[in-house]
């Protein structure tokens, strides 16, 4: 008897996102990510800001940003992954 094999995608705590093509997309991202209770930061090099802060986020939105969550529960982590996948940079070269 063959067992069913399911491939479960592992939830990530970091994504690289880029909003240099649209301030509107950056604003939409901040609005969506603000619905998540966990702390979420945007980082470029040594500069790090609260990803839920529109002003802080827009200051760096023209750069490829590393978005990092410190999840307080599985639901926040799942929602974070759903949001970030919509904006994810598919290939990034430093």
Which functions belong to the PLM regions below?
Residues 1-7:
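N-terminal amphipathic/basic-hydrophobic helices that include classical n-h-c signal peptides
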Residues 8-19:
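Short glycine-/aliphatic-rich beta-strand segments at the starts of folded cytosolic domains
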Residues 45-46, 72:
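Short, ordered loop/turn segments at secondary-structure junctions
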Residues 17-21, 69-73:
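Short beta-strand-to-loop capping motifs
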Residues 11, 63-67:
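Short glycine-rich, basic-tinged beta-strand/loop micro-motifs
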Residues 22-34, 47-63, 76-85:
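Amphipathic alpha-helical interaction surfaces in cytosolic regulatory modules
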